[in-house]
């Protein structure tokens, strides 16, 4: 079982919205999942929540709406599945519509407190990925970059690719964390849960052990 402060398996579907006007009230905290149409975004959400929460399709580009999922064990906190971007075979008008919905959400949604950007580990940091990361940095939104389909690489090449992406993104001077991820093998899943816990609930503060107070009976004066 996934160890986390929030029970992500309590997530449930709320609504699918064509634009931000149809989303739930802009209150509380939202964490959005975004990525290219073939990056494995829906599979990552399903792995995190341990259920078939987000629809997966063998045809990239099928997610056309902003899908909202509510976390049952915490108040006013949501996971957002944003439309996939960058799939070449999508009709141009549909692509423009998706880009408009995505742009409106990212620019105007006040409850957005973190964004998970998923990229195929074999082809990371495409132009649209970089655009999204740069937007997040300029808006002071923290980013968790997941290099998906990590099971396609052995451990050595996988780690080399992670380090390469970390080096590139470190030059951007933003709050960016990079991990390898595989929804098939569960690689990186604890890292995702830990980061989302921080965004939703705040970082874990280490509490120093209470000082031992000695009273006159246990520490008599001479």
Curated annotation (Swiss-Prot):
InterPro entries: G_ENGB_dom, GTP-bd, GTP-bd_ribosome_bio_YsxC, P-loop_NTPase. Belongs to the TRAFAC class TrmE-Era-EngA-EngB-Septin-like GTPase superfamily. EngB GTPase family. Its cofactor is Mg(2+). It comes from Pseudoalteromonas translucida (strain TAC 125). The lineage of its organism: Bacteria, Pseudomonadati, Pseudomonadota, Gammaproteobacteria, Alteromonadales. This is Probable GTP-binding protein EngB. The gene is engB. Mg(2+) binds at residues 42, 63. Signal peptide: none annotated. GO terms for molecular function: GTP binding; metal ion binding. GO terms for biological process: division septum assembly.
